[in-house]
Amino acid sequence: GRGALIKAIHRACPSVTVECYELMPENREFLHTLNNVILLDEDFTKDSVGHYTKIIANPPFSGNQDIEHVRLMYDRLEEGGTLAAITSQHWKFASEKKCIDFRNWLKEVHGEVFEISAGEFKESGTTVSTMAVVIKK
């Protein structure tokens, strides 16, 4: 995206260096202008490097990409680490096998889920209802 999560992280922890991924070229170009940011590969799902103690993400929602990303991020999370991701609400209610499997998996890893009201991200140009998924490994 346009760095909203990065800016929020830097407001709380100004000296932290954030490693990030971004698919869209115009957003990648913008992210290069931010301080304390290391822009990694374009596609998180194709990069197998790195394990992290903290992961904060807003993955793409379409085609259940959000839940696929959450599971991949969990694999990259170090023991004792924390993952926080903004996701769609689709997986919470959908009857697709992938969504059912994700709900069951979240229970297994003791994931916490918080509803985010529609309009909460209006400043970023969206009014869609979302969820926050938080998992401690």
Annotated model-derived regions:
Residues 1-137:
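Class I S-adenosyl-L-methionine-dependent methyltransferase catalytic core
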